[in-house]
Structure formats: C-alpha cells, structure tokens
Amino acid sequence: MELKVETLDRRHALHTLFTHRVLVKGQDRQKNFVQLREWCWEMFGPGVERTLVWHAREDDKTLRYRWCWHIDPANESNLYLYFREETASAFFIRWCN
C-alpha cells in the first residue's frame, strides 16, 4: 500500500482541527482507501467527509470528529484521510511501516 503522509500547517484550511493528512496512492488506491476508511471507523469511531467539517460552525458536532476523509472532486484519484494528533499516531503505527 502506497501512502504519502503530510503534516498540516497554515497553508491547509483545516490545520487548526487536524494535524496530518494521508494521500492514498498506487494502482489499488480505491480499494485501499475503502479498507483504510473502514479501519479508521472501527478504531476511532465515525468519521465524516472533509467538506462537512470545512463548512461547520463552531458549535457544530461535526467539529468533534477525530478523523475525516476527502475525495478531490477535481481529481478523483486524490483520496485523503485527515487525522487529529491522537488518531494520527495509531494510524501511522498500523499502516506506515
């Protein structure tokens, strides 16, 4: 499985909520993305599409999610997972060897 890990900073809109994002790459990226998303759901609880987090208000329950995902509509081969600090470590230990 080919993964590219990025640390989020001020260039990224959600850097105040999430610390890392992972781009799922490679020939089997769609299948791997679904597998990773299912694993995250089981390990960290429900997630949500990034767009919902992006447009959430401060009092919105959406901001409490520990992880989210994003499929880039401009390029559907860009499949991302976003993590808060506490979930990123567990993901990296399991998937980023």
Model feature map: region roles:
Residues 1-73:
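The feature represents the first ordered module of a protein
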Residues 63-97:
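Short, compact, well-ordered microdomains
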